[in-house]
Amino acid sequence: MRHLEKPIRVAVHYCVVRSDVCDGWDVFIGVTLIGMFISYYLYALISICRKGEGLTTSNG
C-alpha cells in the first residue's frame, strides 16, 4: 500500500494549499473514492488469500 501514500499526500496537500478551490463536495468525493479504492484493494487481497488457503487444503 506504500504506493498509495504519495498520491494521497499530494491530493491532501493540493487541497490544503488551494483551499479556495477545494470545497466540501471535493473533500467528500475524494474521501469516497479513496474509501472505495481501499475497500476494493482489501477485498482483492482477502480473496487471493482465501484462494491460496483453498489450494493448500485441497492438496492434502
From Swiss-Prot:
A single Gene Ontology CC term: membrane
Membrane topology: Single-pass membrane protein
Domain of life: Viruses
Main location: host cell
Subcellular location, record wording: Host membrane
Keywords, comma-separated and alphabetical: Host membrane, Membrane, Transmembrane, Transmembrane helix
Record field: transmembrane: 28-48
Name the UniProt record assigns to this protein: Protein P7
Lineage, highest ranks first: Viruses, Riboviria, Orthornavirae, Kitrinoviricota, Alsuviricetes
